[in-house]
Amino acid sequence: MQTVTMYTGPFCPYCAMAKRLLHAAGVGHIDEIRVDASPEAFAEMQQLSGQRSVPQIFIGETHVGGFTDLYRLQQEGGLDGLLNP
């Protein structure tokens, strides 16, 4: 299974929903990076994703996007293939 990295922030309902969706898809561990605790992490997230909002989700080296993008990927049947290439 690919490594899952998620940039998150505090009190973020979309972050919580993304974690639940990923766990339901069989992801046992998510590398969570809190951008509120580190300006460097926020800058890194922006550089890698081009976005300023959380969550930003990466599966392996692939930038999935935010929760809506992850949900759409799951609904279209592409999440499992990305997690288990």
Curated annotation (Swiss-Prot):
Keyword Plastid: no
Keywords: Cytoplasm, Disulfide bond, Electron transport, Redox-active center, Transport
Pfam families assigned: Glutaredoxin
Positions of disulphide bridges: C12-C15
Subcellular location, record wording: Cytoplasm
Biological-process GO terms, alphabetical: cell redox homeostasis
GO cellular component term, pick one: cytoplasm
GO molecular function, one term: electron transfer activity
Keyword Repressor appears in the UniProt entry: no
Residue ranges constituting the Glutaredoxin domain according to the UniProt record: 1-85
Lineage top rank: taxon: Bacteria
Reported function: Has a glutathione-disulfide oxidoreductase activity in the presence of NADPH and glutathione reductase. Reduces low molecular weight disulfides and proteins.
Family membership: Belongs to the glutaredoxin family.
Quaternary structure note: Monomer.
Cited PANTHER family: GLUTAREDOXIN-2, MITOCHONDRIAL (PTHR46679:SF1), PTHR46679
Name of the protein this chain belongs to: Glutaredoxin
Species annotation: Neisseria meningitidis serogroup B (strain ATCC BAA-335 / MC58)
